Regions:
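Conserved GNAT-fold acetyl-CoA-binding loop/helix
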Residues: 16-39
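Conserved GNAT acetyl-CoA-binding A-motif
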Residues: 105-116
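Conserved acetyl-CoA-binding loop-helix of GNAT-fold acetyltransferases
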Residues: 84, 90-103, 130
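A conserved beta-turn-beta hairpin within the catalytic core of GNAT-like acetyltransferases
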Residues: 68-79, 89, 136-137
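A short beta-loop-alpha structural element at the N-terminal edge
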Residues: 1-12
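Conserved beta-strand in the GNAT
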Residues: 51, 57-66, 83
Length: 148
């Protein structure tokens, strides 16, 4: 497991295609994905993208975006874009990647890690619960400012 680089962006887009095919709110758009991935990779204050490689092939990824919580008065992480290719699931790769991401966040002074999953993705809910996450009472709301 290591940090993604700019040269990984095409393969990261392929992983995001897999993820977005499962998520109701998102559709793949490589131009926008490349822009966002580049911004994260190029600025460690924004976040980090962690990847799992098999030889030169990316088989999993997760990103951690950093912000400050006024409730905690400290840095926190938002875990996003967590995906492992289907043919590599159920063999511990996701668990290792998540554990690595949590440790990375802790070492980078994150006092809390938050993530979102689709409401009906029970497999993901069980996975995160097995790994120490719990359902928050907070409910996300979105406003797409380009649509207003």
């Amino acid at each position: 497991i290591d940090k993604a680089t700019l040269t990984d962006i095409p393969q990261l887009c392929t992983l995001l295609d897999e993820l977005f095919s499962q998520e109701a709110e998102f559709t793949p758009n490589h131009t926008l994905q490349e822009k966002g991935l580049s911004k994260i990779i190029s600025n460690e204050n924004v976040g980090v993208i962690l990847v799992v490689r098999e030889s030169q092939k990316l088989i999993g990824m997760v990103n951690i975006l950093f912000t400050i919580s006024t409730a905690l008065g400290e840095r926190v992480g938002n875990l996003e874009d967590f995906v492992v290719l289907p043919e590599y699931r159920n063999c511990g790769i996701g668990t290792k990647l998540l554990s690595y991401a949590v440790t990375f966040a802790e070492k980078n002074d994150c006092q809390r890690i938050t993530l979102l999953t689709d409401d009906d993705n029970e497999d993901a809910h069980r996975f995160y619960a097995r790994n120490g996450f719990y359902r928050s009472s907070m409910v996300p709301f979105r406003l797409n400012t380009l649509d207003t």
